[in-house]
Amino acid sequence: MHDPGRAAYTGPMTRNTRTIPANVSPEAAALLERAYAIDSDATSRALYRDWAETYDATMLDGLRYRSPALVAALLGEHLPDRTAQVLDVGCGTGLAGQSLAELGFELIDGMDISPEMMQVAARRGVYRHFIAADLNQPLDMPDAHYDGAACSGTFTHGHVDARCLDELFRILRPGAPFAFTVKREVWEPLGFKDALQRLMAEGRITESAFRLDRHYDSSEQPDGVFCVYRRT
């Protein structure tokens, strides 16, 4: 069995290791630090309530954020049917959904904890439905509901740990790919390596793609794990 942690993890990392890309504005760095410091659902909701209207400018202009487009492209490579029902997990303001729509996907649902972020995402006109959900809790959704899923910017410091993976794969149909990225610094500390290995050992998922890449153009080295796993 392939060990995803072998390529991704090269030395000791802790929950307190938080890398801010170089050469970004002080405003962008401050917001990213605030995001990394989230310690509860309440602080998460408060941050994204305050950040919703300026998030895109901060991430695209201030940080030169590339993860949403990369994750969308990964899903597009592994899900050729553009009429498939796709879930954008932690959709935020819809950056990944916009990229999915540009690739031709027609049936995209967005899921997020922040109503303010989803209100911004709705303006893009690319989503079919929105689902308010806390990924740290069981999802009120039927089994085998989606043909594929994408997730960018959610599996990072202070947001959601690997316990959500069981639920996310549960709502995917057999054979459905899930393309996502995990902040490299939390790959092991927040349990993603172990959870994925367990799910593979149980025969519930298979690995389709795995690589290291940069979340931001301003990053000096790969700071994210980008991968695709399929529900069996």
Identify the function of each model-found stretch.
Residues L190-R211:
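Conserved Class I S-adenosyl-L-methionine
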Residues G175-K183:
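Conserved beta-strand signature within the Rossmann-like core of class I S-adenosyl-L-methionine
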Residues Y216-T232:
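Core SAM-dependent methyltransferase catalytic element
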Residues Y65-R82:
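Conserved alpha-helix/loop element of class I SAM-dependent methyltransferases that forms part
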Residues L87-P138:
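Class I SAM-dependent methyltransferase SAM/SAH-binding core
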Residues R163-P174:
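A short glycine-rich, Lys/Arg-flanked "PGG" loop and its adjoining helix->strand segment in the class I
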Residues L139-A149:
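A short acidic, Gly/Pro-enriched loop at the edge of an enzyme's catalytic core
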Residues H2, R6, T10-D41:
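N-terminal auxiliary segments of SAM/dcSAM-dependent transferases
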